[in-house]
């Protein structure tokens, strides 16, 4: 459903041209983490996605600040018990659903614990 905003639809032909600049990776920490995970491979991308889901959920529930999302995601990517799962070279192997769900469950548990620690004033 779309809300009527009174604004005309975007017409790219009428706009003419767009200019894209390199993103500031210090300001956009989650983009930096996504690029890092992409370099590491499939398992790291699964870990990043799961940690992000949990962190965003906590933010929307007002349990953490917006800037804590990147902190939680990075802490999960740096966590040794998660890293051992994604540090394996999967190469071109397509991960099965069972393997993905196992990783997802593990990251959810760790991300939730890290959020709890952060809320208690702990350092990640």
Mark where each language-model region is.
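Catalytic, metal-anchored helix/loop core of enzyme active sites in primary metabolism
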Residues: 1-124
């Amino acid at each position: 459903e779309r809300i009527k905003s009174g604004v005309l639809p975007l017409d790219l032909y009428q706009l003419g041209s767009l200019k894209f600049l390199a993103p500031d990776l210090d300001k956009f920490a989650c983009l930096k983490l996504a690029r890092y995970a992409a370099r590491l491979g499939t398992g790291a991308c699964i870990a990043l996605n799961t940690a992000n889901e949990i962190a965003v959920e906590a933010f929307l529930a007002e349990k953490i600040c917006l800037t804590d999302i990147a902190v939680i995601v990075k802490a999960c990517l740096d966590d040794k018990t998660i890293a051992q799962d994604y540090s394996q070279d999967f190469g071109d192997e397509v991960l099965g659903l069972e393997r993905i769900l196992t990783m997802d469950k593990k990251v959810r548990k760790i991300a939730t614990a890290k959020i709890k620690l952060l809320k208690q004033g702990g350092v990640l």
